[in-house]
Curated annotation (Swiss-Prot):
UniProt-listed InterPro entries: NTF2-like_dom_sf, UPF0225, YchJ-like_M
Protein name in UniProt: UPF0225 protein BPP1723
Domain of life: Bacteria
SUPFAM superfamilies: NTF2-like (SSF54427)
A Pfam family matched in the record: YchJ_M-like
Assigned protein family: Belongs to the UPF0225 family.
Length: 133
């Protein structure tokens, strides 16, 4: 796992806040796993991917679709940014977030464009799955 950014560092999710005041609060501490909505969870999951916080990713993945394990980022992967294209809550317990995540691997830029589905159970949001665009 990579070390989270120090206090003045911007959050990897792209919000204009320091990591501890943004996604860091969902990754550890009193608000651990308590992202208030699907978009916040999506942003916190992106930050967790950037920081190789695999336990957080697994804990925020719905048990019905969760893989048994995740591999850390390859050494040549550099995450470049997240853009939220759309965020929509269908009802109190279902939401979707469309995003584009940019990364560079082996010197080659690529992007992941996904429409992700989220569900809220027992007061917690979970990533369920997504459709690659």
């Amino acid at each position: 796992m990579k070390k989270p950014p120090s206090s003045p560092a911007a959050c990897p999710c792209g919000k204009p806040r320091a990591y501890p005041d943004c996604c860091g609060r969902w990754h550890a501490g009193a608000l651990f796993l308590q992202a208030p909505d699907a978009e916040s969870l999506m942003r916190s999951r992106y930050s967790a991917f950037v920081l190789d916080q695999l336990d957080y990713l697994l804990q925020t993945w719905h048990p019905d679709t969760r893989p048994s394990e995740l591999e850390p980022n390859a050494a040549d992967v550099k995450w470049l940014g997240l853009q939220i294209k759309a965020s929509q809550q269908q009802d109190d317990t279902h939401a979707t977030v469309e995003f584009v995540a940019r990364l560079r691997q082996a010197g080659r830029a690529t992007r992941l464009h996904e429409l992700s589905r989220f569900v809220k159970e027992e007061q917690r949001w979970y990533y369920v799955d997504g459709d690659i665009r």
